[in-house]
Amino acid sequence: MALWIRSLPLLALLVFSGPGTSYAAANQHLCGSHLVEALYLVCGERGFFYSPKARRDVEQPLVSSPLRGEAGVLPFQQEEYEKVKRGIVEQCCHNTCSLYQLENYCN
């Protein structure tokens, strides 16, 4: 497949995120190969690093205790659990992100 055809999603991203566009148009849902291509575009020669968290690293343990509430979390742990740092997929695929937010994932 021609390189220019594969670059179309990046071109669209550049057009919608250029100066003079509205804030809503600048933020995009970027998933899969579109996210990787956008990172290559934003990071350039610096490159980027992404290490997906294992599911067990972000889930709560299934231990039950009489002190735990309905959600299985101790009352003082709930706030800490909600502060888990979002990864790039959560930030840019599940939600929308800007090119400036993508730069946070560059080396």
UniProtKB/Swiss-Prot annotation:
One of its GO terms (biological process) is gene expression. Residues 57-84 form a propeptide. Residues 1-24 form the signal peptide. CDD domains: IlGF_insulin_like. GO terms for molecular function: hormone activity. Gene3D superfamilies: Insulin-like. Insulin decreases blood glucose concentration. It increases cell permeability to monosaccharides, amino acids and fatty acids. It accelerates glycolysis, the pentose phosphate cycle, and glycogen synthesis in liver. This is Insulin.
